[in-house]
Amino acid sequence: ENGLFVPLCAAFFAIAAAPAAGCVISYYISAGQEDYRRMKGETLRSGETGIPMGKALLILFAVSVVGISAILRANFYYMDDSPRAALGYKQWDYFSRYLSTALATLVHGGDYLVDAAPLPQMLAMLIMAVSGILMGYIFCERTTFSGWELAVLSILGLNPYFLGCVSFRFDAPYMAFSVLAAVVPLLYRNRNTAAYLLVSGLGILAVCTSYQAAAGIFPMLVVALALRMWNRGESIREVGLFCLKSAAGYALGLLFFKLVIMIPADTNYVGNALPSAGELIPHFLENLRSYYSLILSDFKPFWRIAAVLAAAAFCVRTVLDSRRRTLPAIAMTAVALILMGMMCFGLYPALASTVFAPRAMYGFGVLLTVFGMTAAEGKTRVPLKIPAVVLSWVFFVFSFTYGNALSVQKDYTDFRTRLVISDLQEVEAFRSDAPVTVQLSGSLGKEPVLWNMPQNYQMLNRLIPDTFGGGDDLTQYGFYCYYDLQNVVWNPDVDLREMDLPVLEDNMYHTIRGEGRYVLVELK
């Protein structure tokens, strides 16, 4: 009876809260529709022409899907895609990503995650397209868009760091949803304080329970909007009140997540603990420096030039359009630029053990989108639009390069895996039905042809994961689970590298050592 008490109480409160939740949702839907009708009327009265929001969404989604078509064609199992497809597990709860777990049940039609690719990845690009259109709607305050604006909005979903997210066959929609959850609260920034605080808190809570790497997007967009408000001539009090309400809603969501929902997590690559108070700021700045060092090495020279010019165009456009005096406008733009640059990676730089993988850095893609969206706004000052549009084009092209590289890596992995299996068949231990412990050592690395792409290699090197080797469960699932190896046993409790096993086979691709019921494969 005691075991049923908590679930029954939870069910009771969920049922009791349903009417209130319905009223809240109904209010926000009605408020959003009312604001849209008002904005559409203002757009018509202003004489602004362009692509309507609905058509703009379809265009942006189509461009995004075409952009990732090479990734979809590669049919690549990215990192933990292999074990998820083999075992159907979720396990996002370990990182307190309960919303991802719940949404995955809906997307995959049950608790067991079936491989439904490319549906999740296409859903992710639809969510990113919606996020981009909403960002344009929020910043430009109109319901039509120009071709320039749509071009730069494609950066949001096709920047190299988000490509590392959409590569996941299972995780992609929830990574994209974290961006949408950070954008939606800003639709209600002009509503009453209570409504804005609540939706901001809920939005940040949704970010933290889907993918925490997006935790810096909301405050970054708040800073960009505050700068626009100030440049339009709105009073310091109005701008300050907007920032204060946004900060309060953000803190509300973070505190609730930290105190009520979050569970401590610590893996071999990331944890959610913070350093001591005295070390927090130096640690944050050091990690921030590491993130930007990675960006400098990831981006080839032409990308870096285009990104810097896009940032410069953002600054110039902001100052030229400002109703304030030039020097204060320059100063405020510089402050906003620094703040956004510090916020775009969210809370990750503050973690004692953080992650520097490309998938954790897509906030920088949002920052580039903000730069481009500001520079491309309107029909004037065409030269300022060019850097961001060029950046959107090179990212579009790179998405095909990356997808093709995944395909090449997959073929190389299959080739090397089949060679190992073929040679194992000749080992005497496999001539009976008795189980044999087989371990992998070393790694095949990247496909040799990728080394011939010096301009793209560093970005590709970080985006393309290890696919076959020892020491990491994610690089071994394919070998142990996908080839129906009848009498092969995966036993991580014993380390065959410590045994002096005799060489049974040695060739240019691998060395096979073995004795009795133990076999070690050393990949070269």
Residue spans of the language-model regions?
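Alpha-helical transmembrane segments of multi-pass membrane proteins
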Residues: 126-129, 176-187, 200, 217, ...
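Signature aromatic-anchored transmembrane alpha helix within multi-pass, membrane-resident enzymes
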Residues: 195, 377-400
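Start-transfer (signal-anchor) and selected internal transmembrane alpha helices
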Residues: 5-66
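Membrane-helix interface segments
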Residues: 116-118, 143-149, 192-198, 235, ...
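Membrane-interface transmembrane helices that cradle and orient dolichyl/undecaprenyl
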Residues: 182-197, 229-234
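Membrane-embedded helix bundles of polyisoprenyl
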Residues: 147-166, 173-183, 200-204
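Transmembrane catalytic cores of multi-pass membrane glycosyltransferases
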Residues: 1, 5-6, 12, 16-19, ...
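Intrinsically disordered, polar/acidic, low-complexity terminal segments
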Residues: 43-94, 98, 104, 108-131, ...
